[in-house]
Design a protein with these regions (language model features):
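Active-site and adjacent substrate-binding regions of carbohydrate-active enzymes
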Residues: 1-249
Length: 249
């Protein structure tokens, strides 16, 4: 959705009346600048225009304010908890939350909010528990249920994302930052982290294709893949199934 202006809700109500109301569908708006109050208005069950919105407040908490997503700072857990609580209480009884940790434009959840070492499985389950135990509709991005992680390629040529390539050129060629400084930010926030081929098995090309994928595989596909997860009753995948079943019951 575009940033809110004086006629925003009037336009949204017109779209709802003329288009959306003619279909049996769920509507979700991407609202990166929305406040809790604006989301209440948009998703109000009686007077709103959409069923739910994607808000981005918790997506900016590991970036330096006003400096863009590439300017990294450590995530402060109390701030994250306060943000999630604010959106939970703010929309309770009026609007509706979209719950998510990652998507095609964000890094992998377990790399960003959890641990990719010995606690990868536990931290992935912790994030899944948090997501599914809040009020709202959980959105699970492909590979999240396996605990797929960020990549850490050392050469910019390995990346396909135009945002990443442009940022690298600007930072190194015009701002004088070192290759390693920029790659540290890319490893943490690059969009290609979430765009590597789905890891189906430990077979050639992770079982994704018999050809050559557009983007290289994550090197850990032999250990992190769907075939392995389905065979392990204590896997992240089966834990997600338990959480979904719990919500449905």
């Amino acid at each position: 959705m575009v940033t809110q202006g004086p006629r925003f809700m009037a336009c949204m109500h017109e779209m709802k009346r003329e288009v959306l109301d003619h279909y049996d569908c769920i509507t979700v708006g991407e609202a990166p600048c929305a406040t809790v109050e604006q989301a209440q208005e948009i998703t109000d069950s009686n007077t709103g225009a959409l069923n739910m919105v994607f808000q981005f407040e918790h997506m900016d908490m590991d970036s330096q304010p006003g400096k863009g997503k590439w300017a990294l700072k450590p995530l402060h857990l109390p701030d994250l908890k306060a943000s999630l609580s604010r959106w939970q209480t703010g929309l309770h009884g009026t609007g509706w939350n979209s719950l998510y940790w990652c998507n095609h434009d964000q890094p992998r959840a377990v790399s960003r909010f959890g641990d990719t070492g010995i606690h990868r499985v536990r931290s992935a389950k912790m994030l899944a528990t948090c997501l599914h135990m809040m009020q709202g509709t959980p959105f699970i991005y492909q590979g999240e249920e396996l605990g797929m992680t960020n990549v850490a390629w050392q050469h910019i040529e390995a990346y396909q994302d135009i945002e990443t390539r442009n940022m690298y050129a600007q930072a190194v060629n015009h701002k004088g930052l070192s290759h390693q400084e920029v790659m540290t930010s890319i490893h943490a926030k690059g969009r290609d982290n979430a765009r590597t081929p789905m890891q189906w098995s430990a077979a050639h090309q992770a079982g994704f294709t018999t050809g050559s994928p557009w983007l290289a595989l994550n090197n850990n596909f032999a250990q992190v893949n769907a075939q392995q997860a389905l065979a392990d009753p204590d896997s992240i995948f089966h834990y997600y199934r338990q959480l979904i079943s719990l919500r449905q019951s």
